[in-house]
Structure formats: structure tokens, C-alpha cells
């Protein structure tokens, strides 16, 4: 029997990582925990990430408007980035096919085609898609209050890595919001400025009890296989 997959979608500051962690902590049954933050920080080699010297081969931040090189940035995938993201999605599928429940947080934009790739790679498996979407202003306030506390591989990224990362993320933020929330198909959408983490977990649990999610099936009707 396939394990249940829960995908928690939302941009930085939406509460997706906190929700995923609290959901697993609240359960007596067996749930694996993974997500885009784990993947980017601990699985993808730093030199191929969007702050690294070989980002063009992996996941690169490039100008949204080539005529404005100092403006908003967006993500672009190189060959290793495409292969890595496909693997990330296949891992979720492998967990389910082995009978494990898994909850993971994600940034489900359609360009690059994270949304389409995941929807098709998880075809035939039970997936519940949850989108956490607080207002833009709330997100910006939350992100502004965050401190850079991650241990950075300065031997790869350089001694001024923290400053460069903060600057790059600031320039990605507007694009992330538009790209991640462009898709309106979801099994459950929650405003985390209104509902706290415990309430969000309870709402996800209640939706699970209602039956299987249908959002990914709907997405496969909208988006061709990438």
C-alpha cells in the first residue's frame, strides 16, 4: 500500500517548514520529513546552488529582466539542477511506493517547471497539496525579522557569503511570491497570518480525514508532462 504524501507549498516566510515539522511531531504514526530547504542546504552541493560558483550548471539566480541586471532575480536550472530536482521529486515517490508516509515543503513554481515535474512524477500516488499563503506584506515583515544563522561553507562561497546571500535573496523575493502563488489549484489553502502553526496542522489533519487529494490530478490535466 502506498504511503501518503503531503506537499506544503509556500514561499519564504509562509511557515511551510515549521508546519511540516510540527505535523510530523504531532503524529503517532510514521512520517518522513524532507523539503526544499533540506535539499538546497544539505543535499545540493553548495557550489552548484544559486549562491555558488557553478550555479549555472545547477540552480542559478539570473535577472528577471535582462535589461535590468541589478533588479529582481529569478531561478534558472542548468543540467545538474534539472537532474537534481527530478531526483528530489522521485525520492518523494520512492518513499510512498515503499509504504512510507512523507511530508515535505516546496516552492512549486511552473517556471522552472517544479510544479509540473512533481505532479507527473507522483502520478498514481496519494498526494495532498497544501498551500500556505499569507499576505505579501506579512511575508516581507517576517523575512525582514529573520537573522542569517545558517552555517555557511565559506571555503566554497567566500568569506562575504552571508552578505551576498542576503542581498541575492532580497532580489529573489518578489519573483518567488509571484511564481510560487501563480498556481491556484490546491487541496487546501491557508492564510498563516490568520492561523497559527497548531491550527494549520489541525486543518491539514482534518483535510486528510476527508479523503484523498485531487489537486495533482487536476494539475496533470492543465500541464503537459515536461
Which residue stretches match the model-derived regions?
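Glycine-rich phosphate-binding loop used to anchor ATP phosphates in small-molecule kinases
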Residues: 70-123
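P-loop (Walker A) phosphate-binding loop of NTP-binding proteins
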Residues: 11
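Conserved substrate/cofactor phosphate-moiety recognition/catalytic segment
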Residues: 21-83
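Small-molecule kinase domains that catalyze NTP-dependent phosphoryl transfer to phosphate-bearing small molecules
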Residues: 148-203, 215-226
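Hydrophobic anchor at the beta1->P-loop junction of P-loop NTPases
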Residues: 8
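ATP-binding Walker
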Residues: 14
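Walker A/P-loop
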Residues: 17
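Conserved phosphate-donor/acceptor-positioning beta-strand/loop module used by diverse small-molecule
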Residues: 123-146
Amino acid at each position: 500500500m502506498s504511503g501518503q504524501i503531503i506537499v506544503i507549498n509556500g514561499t519564504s516566510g509562509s511557515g511551510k517548514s515549521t508546519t511540516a515539522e510540527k505535523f510530523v511531531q504531532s503524529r503517532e504514526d510514521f512520517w518522513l520529513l524532507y523539503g526544499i530547504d533540506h535539499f538546497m542546504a544539505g543535499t545540493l552541493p553548495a557550489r552548484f546552488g544559486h549562491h555558488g560558483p557553478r550555479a549555472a550548471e545547477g540552480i542559478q539566480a539570473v535577472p528577471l529582466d535582462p535589461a535590468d541586471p541589478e533588479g529582481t532575480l529569478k531561478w534558472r536550472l542548468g543540467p545538474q539542477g534539472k537532474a537534481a530536482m527530478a531526483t528530489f521529486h522521485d525520492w518523494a515517490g520512492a518513499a510512498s511506493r515503499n509504504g512510507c508516509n512523507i511530508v515535505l515543503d516546496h516552492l512549486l513554481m511552473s517556471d522552472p517547471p517544479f510544479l509540473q515535474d512533481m505532479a507527473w512524477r507522483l502520478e498514481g500516488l496519494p498526494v495532498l497539496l497544501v498551500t500556505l499563503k499569507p499576505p505579501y506584506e506579512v511575508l516581507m515583515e517576517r523575512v525582514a525579522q529573520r537573522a542569517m544563522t545558517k552555517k555557511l561553507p565559506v571555503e566554497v562561497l567566500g568569506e562575504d557569503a552571508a552578505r551576498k546571500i542576503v542581498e541575492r535573496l532580497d532580489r529573489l523575493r518578489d519573483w518567488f511570491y509571484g511564481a510560487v502563488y501563480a498556481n491556484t489549484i490546491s487541496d487546501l489553502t491557508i492564510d498563516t497570518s490568520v492561523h497559527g502553526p497548531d491550527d494549520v496542522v489541525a486543518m491539514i489533519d482534518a483535510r486528510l480525514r476527508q479523503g484523498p487529494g485531487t489537486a495533482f490530478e487536476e494539475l496533470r490535466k492543465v500541464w503537459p508532462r515536461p
